From Swiss-Prot:
The active site is at residue 240. PANTHER family: INOSINE-URIDINE PREFERRING NUCLEOSIDE HYDROLASE, URIDINE NUCLEOSIDASE. The gene is rihA. One of its GO terms (molecular function) is purine nucleosidase activity. GO terms for biological process: nucleobase-containing small molecule interconversion; purine nucleoside catabolic process; pyrimidine nucleobase metabolic process. The lineage of its organism: Bacteria, Pseudomonadati, Pseudomonadota, Gammaproteobacteria, Alteromonadales. It comes from Shewanella sp. (strain MR-4). NCBIfam families: PRK10443.1. GO terms for cellular component: cytosol. This is Pyrimidine-specific ribonucleoside hydrolase RihA. Keywords: Glycosidase, Hydrolase. Gene3D superfamilies: Ribonucleoside hydrolase-like. HAMAP family: Pyrim_hydro_RihA. Pfam families: IU_nuc_hydro. Its EC number is 3.2.-.-. Hydrolyzes cytidine or uridine to ribose and cytosine or uracil, respectively.
């Protein structure tokens, strides 16, 4: 039985690869793709989702744009990481279809309402759309099986010393999500910084004879540029967002611990910090399954095997 999911993203190189990974597996049933501002401006992230789905010949998946800015803060984007388009590197096709007339929150609500099974939400950008959905559609909480998100860190941040980018962009939204009572899987920097793609992995991907693998290799060529800065101490480039999909497909690849996680929304120094209580020091009940470790080679093999699925026959099956 396939698991119904909604991908809420801000493409973004690693968002695009997460989307490509998800759509290679029939055990995941994407009901919709929604977008928010984050890695680039809202018009560009929406266009990028349409471009990736056009590449995959999946115009059957409804797409809607969502929040153009955080709940109560000014928009911040990561164009220094993802380039002018948000997906710099490959020559992607122009969109072959249009987004839905409704916004992201209403499309998510409609798909959750219509689903005969609980739906898993997979946000890989700022959590604004998810927070708005939870705040405006309390009647649907019971139909959300889990929120599998990329965001946060138990250790150091990547946008400030204390905060990871997605949470820092809209900490108030993250606070709503983590207080919702809905089961959460948190794929934070602790695990995603271990999910590094190396030069030799990119060459494995480039050798796969299909246009989707070629696109991913070229996305990774560009993504590598930012992460070669010696300050990070990386050998490769961390594939943050695909960890969410990899966990859904094979949770055995990961080491995890149930923890209480709180969001800092006030401090000047630590705004956007995810406070992860690994040692039950607060006495608060756990609200998230936090990923701390990954079988990196197993993760890379999953990605490579998934990209090999996208033969011309597979892409033209619809």
């Amino acid at each position: 039985m396939s698991r119904p999911i909604i991908l809420d993203c801000d493409p973004g190189h690693d968002d695009a690869i997460a989307l490509i990974l998800a759509l290679a597996h029939p055990e995941l049933n994407p009901l919709a793709v929604t977008t928010s501002a984050g890695n680039q401006t809202p018009d560009k992230t929406l266009n990028n989702a349409l471009r990736i789905l056009t590449l995959l010949n999946r115009s059957d998946i409804p797409v809607a744009g969502g929040a153009v800015k955080p709940l109560s803060r000014e928009l911040m984007i990561a164009d220094n990481v993802h380039g002018e388009t948000g997906l710099d590197g490959p020559a992607l096709p122009a969109p072959s279809f249009q987004p839905q007339a409704v916004n992201a929150v209403e499309l998510m609500a409609e798909k959750i309402r219509q689903s005969d099974k609980p739906v898993t939400l997979v946000p890989t950008g700022p959590l604004t759309n998810i927070a708005l959905l939870l705040a405006s559609h309390g009647e649907l909480h019971a139909k959300i099986e889990r929120i599998v998100l990329m965001g946060g860190a138990a250790g150091v941040g990547n946008w400030t010393p204390a905060a990871e980018f997605n949470i820092f962009v809209d900490p108030e939204a993250a606070d709503i999500v983590f207080k919702s009572g809905i089961p959460i899987t948190m794929c934070g920097l602790d695990v995603t910084h271990q999910a590094q793609i190396m030069d030799e992995d990119i060459e494995r991907i480039r050798a796969i004879p299909n246009p989707v693998a070629k696109c991913v290799a070229e996305l990774l060529d560009f993504f590598m540029i930012y992460h070669r800065d010696p300050k990070w101490g990386f050998v490769g480039a961390p594939l943050h967002d695909p960890c969410t999909i990899a966990w859904l497909l094979n949770p055995a690849l990961f080491d995890a611990q149930d923890c209480w996680v709180g969001i800092e929304t006030q401090s000047e120094l630590t705004l956007g910090m995810t406070v992860v209580d690994r040692y039950q020091l607060t006495g608060k009940p756990t609200n998230a399954t936090v990923l701390f470790g990954i079988d990196r080679q197993g993760f890379v093999d999953l990605l490579v095997d998934s990209l090999a699925v996208y033969t011309p026959t597979y892409l033209n099956r619809r």
